[in-house]
């Protein structure tokens, strides 16, 4: 007759210690490892594509979550419990074009002339209407792109914001020299630009406190553009990002845009993604209030060739770069123009099932647990 097994307190503690890492992994907890440069992170991919537009053709896109493990709003709603994006919410000051091509100033045109109270009132209305759930727990994205709060960065199509800002100061001080006028225009623009962006974010966090809030595209990098041809972010841009800690400390999530361009080489496309993710991770590491998630915005089409889906090679190389650098996941974005006909919906579903979905599952979500979740946050290499 066998003797009964006696489980001692020491044995029980040993078993619990062995099970603890497994339980933490299954429950999605974040754990530090003995190496201070490594941490265990959850990795999530979000669906921010308006595929609800295809429902009228009998195409439901259930496989997004069921087959590929991508976080998708219930019933494929565009705004739901996982993610909600607010396009140009509120009444930010902006210079817009009317149907005739004439420039019209909305709410003052530039932040230093804008009515913040009016903007916040409209923003609250938009938020209540578009995210009615007060306990919304997902990723909340504020997509405002009319101007940037760093005066220098309003170039190209955004140059009118600098021009108007300078004109206002020159009218007030006709005897000032050009340098003094521009310095004052810069000071005012950045002061009130910060105020509008800060107060908007505060309002969003007050009204939907369970959400993870961030501004689309920030931090910027501008790498692999005509004026910044390197894959690395330019030092000036990085210094300006450091000065924007007022924004990044308040955000819960950093959302750099890593849209690819056809006119780059395959290696440059990987470099573009690497440089922008690396900069977001650098900023995230500097923050003192809380750990900031980094979720790059990823489009499955080439930004400068919108009728062309990303190739399998570009999908695999760039998704692998995002995971290898240690981001917390990424957000798959799509335009309504991508799927505004039945033919486009059918073509996109084929692409999803043949290329995009399998690549996401294979590279981002189906990696070995240690390779996927234990990531090196020392991002010295792009």
From Swiss-Prot:
Cysteine disulfide partners in this protein: 54-345, 221-233
Localization, UniProt: Secreted
GO BP terms: carbohydrate metabolic process; defense response; hyaluronan catabolic process
Tissue specificity statement from the Swiss-Prot or TrEMBL entry: Expressed in the venom glands of worker bees. It is also detected in the testes of drones but not in the queen-bee venom glands or in pupae.
Species, as recorded: Apis mellifera (Honeybee)
GO terms for cellular component: extracellular region
Lineage: Eukaryota, Metazoa, Ecdysozoa, Arthropoda, Hexapoda
Record family assignment: Belongs to the glycosyl hydrolase 56 family.
Name of this protein: Hyaluronidase
């Amino acid at each position: 007759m066998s003797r009964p097994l006696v489980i001692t307190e020491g044995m029980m503690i040993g078993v619990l210690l062995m099970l603890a890492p497994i339980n933490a992994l299954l429950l999605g907890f974040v754990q530090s490892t003995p190496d201070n440069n490594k941490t265990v992170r959850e990795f999530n991919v979000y669906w921010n594509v308006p595929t609800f537009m295809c429902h009228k053709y009998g195409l439901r896109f259930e496989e997004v979550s069921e087959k590929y493990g991508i976080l998708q709003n219930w019933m494929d709603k565009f705004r739901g419990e996982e993610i909600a994006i607010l396009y140009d919410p509120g009444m930010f000051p902006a210079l817009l074009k009317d149907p005739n091509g004439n420039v019209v100033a909305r709410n003052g045109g530039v932040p230093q002339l804008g009515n913040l109270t009016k903007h916040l009132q409209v923003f609250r209305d938009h938020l209540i209407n578009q995210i009615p759930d007060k306990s919304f727990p997902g990723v909340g994205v504020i997509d405002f792109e009319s101007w940037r709060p760093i005066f220098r960065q309003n170039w190209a199509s955004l140059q009118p914001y600098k021009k108007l800002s300078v004109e206002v100061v020159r009218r007030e001080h006709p005897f000032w020299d050009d340098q003094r006028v521009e310095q004052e225009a810069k000071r005012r623009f950045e002061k009130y630009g910060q105020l509008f962006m800060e107060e908007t974010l505060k309002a969003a966090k007050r009204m939907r406190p369970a959400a993870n809030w961030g501004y689309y595209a920030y931090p910027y990098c501008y790498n692999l553009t005509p004026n910044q041809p390197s894959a690395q972010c330019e030092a000036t841009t990085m210094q300006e990002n450091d000065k924007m800690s007022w924004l990044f400390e308040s955000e819960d999530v950093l959302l750099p845009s890593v849209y690819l361009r056809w006119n780059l080489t395959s290696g440059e496309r990987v470099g573009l993604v690497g440089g922008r993710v690396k900069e977001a991770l650098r900023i995230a590491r500097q923050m003192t209030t809380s750990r900031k998630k980094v979720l790059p915005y990823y489009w499955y089409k080439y930004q400068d060739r919108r009728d062309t889906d990303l190739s399998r090679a570009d999908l695999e190389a760039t998704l692998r770069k995002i995971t290898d650098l240690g981001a917390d996941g990424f957000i798959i974005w799509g335009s309504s123009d991508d799927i505004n006909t039945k033919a486009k919906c059918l073509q996109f579903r084929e692409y999803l099932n043949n290329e995009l979905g399998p690549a996401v599952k294979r590279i981002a979500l189906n990696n070995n647990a240690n390779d996927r979740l234990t990531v090196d946050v020392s991002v010295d290499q792009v």
